[in-house]
Amino acid sequence: SDLGEDNYFEMKKYIVIVFTGLLMSIPALAQLFWNKANMRNVKMQIDKQPYKSAYDALIKKADLYLLEPHLSVVNDKDHIPASGDIHDYMSIGRYTWPDTTKADGLPYIERDGYTNPEYYTYDREVLLKMVDRVKTFTLAWYFSDDSRYASAAVGQIRVWFLKKETYMNPNMYYGQIVKGYTYLNATAVLDGAGFVDMIDALYLLDDYHSWMWHRDLKRVKKWFGQFLDWIETSDQGVRQNKSRDNTGTSYDLQRLAYNLYCGRVENAQEILNNFVEKRILKQIDDEGVQVEEIKRTSSFGYSVSNISVMMNFIIIACNQGLQLTPESLTRFYKAVNYLIPYLDENKQWPYQEISNMKYYRKRLCFELFRIETCIDKSKTNYLKLYEKYGKMSDNDINVLLY
């Protein structure tokens, strides 16, 4: 049934009861997204389909990465932030462009949904590539037992976070700047979301037996603690926390992931307790429409992307042993169901969409797969839709993880 205003406060109370106290028994190294028990089963059958193709693709990718130097926020920097410190992360707003009516193009103006090619010359792209390397090396090591890959993952982590010459300062003050303005953007915090994707690799690398690495791993955790402090207490972070769209969801996902990784269990529990009320109920209306996302020029894309972030949040909760009931996720499922008819390319999306619908349809299919696989096995209809409209290819690395 719909979560209307009449039972809103009762449901809020129920959700808090569901969450309270359960985090205290979380294992010290519980994975965020990756299901380690499932990965162990996959590993025992890695030379058989449906896993062999994905494994071969993983190893091929890792071997190519082995040939390349480690990435850093220092060595691969094309632009220097206002601080003059090359260790400071820097990016520009993705949709900001030179003002063609001005001789110098300044200040930049917003063109929502249109990516300025300059965006790719800043640190954001390097960060995402670094995260992908750490994940790829770590998974290649786990499934192959070849220590070369673990060594490469550890080396990349040291270069980005620890090495004196190349480390990144634990903040993003100069993220998503708008050229021509001096203010610091609240959305800078969002660039850190890429780090969430490598936390599971850090957990897995705890099993890599190297005395020096375990010493360094403590330093990495300290770095993330400092980064988390910046996210939660800086003016940019405080402002971002008030966001009522996908950026607010992403902000809380980072906070949840880093609090868990740093062992700040009570903080993580508070974030979980507030999630349904603070994010889901305020972003999704009774019909399942994500009211802020449909205002965007890429409204379907942002609606799907926000579902993906919410899914990450929910999967983390489930993997930490929290029992999320279907009742507590009523509004979330409404949002998913609202998008499903538009998997059919003949069905016209009623709002503006300038981006690649095909890409986001496939991404929605992946979320339907994750819902059935990770959250609710009764959602067999979601699995059928996934298989009909956007099943993963055999060489997709996610085949090994879910």
Write out the residue ranges for each language-model feature:
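Bacterial N-terminal signal peptides
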Residues: 17-25
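Extracellular glycan-targeting catalytic surfaces
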Residues: 30-238, 273-276, 284, 316-319, ...
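Loop-centered beta-sheet repeat module
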Residues: 223-259
